[in-house]
Amino acid sequence: MKEYNVGYCAGVYDLFHIGHVNLFRRAKEKCETLIVGVLTDELVIHFKKNPPYIPFEERLQMVESCRYVDRAIPVTFDNIGKIDAWDQLHYDCFFSGDDYSGNEVWMKEKRLLNERGSDIYFFSYTQTTSSTKIKQAIEAQIRKEM
């Protein structure tokens, strides 16, 4: 039996890469059912001020096709917060990369989840690849070709 019944993680998952797969694999090793939230284009634009490279429906399909993911759902303004998502899904653990482990807001949310019988678990961040690094490499190549 695994440590958690239902696990949840959420993200943009633009330019899907090995870091995303590592997160899903590690999360699935700890839970029976893994639900992954994918931020809508509207949310990405709201928070990052730029649209994702890959449209929402395609990002959702890529996440759904990953063998470690049991269910992929849209993340909207109604369920962007970890507590709002918990109210809808009643997950036992929220999984994330450790790049957020010292974040004050995340620690507050961890306490609120603990009060509901849930937790946040941080995995080591995949250092070699990130969407940001991929975007920077693409942009550098475009500038070089101009």
Each model region followed by its residue ranges:
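Nucleotidyltransferase catalytic core that binds NTPs
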Residues: M1-M146
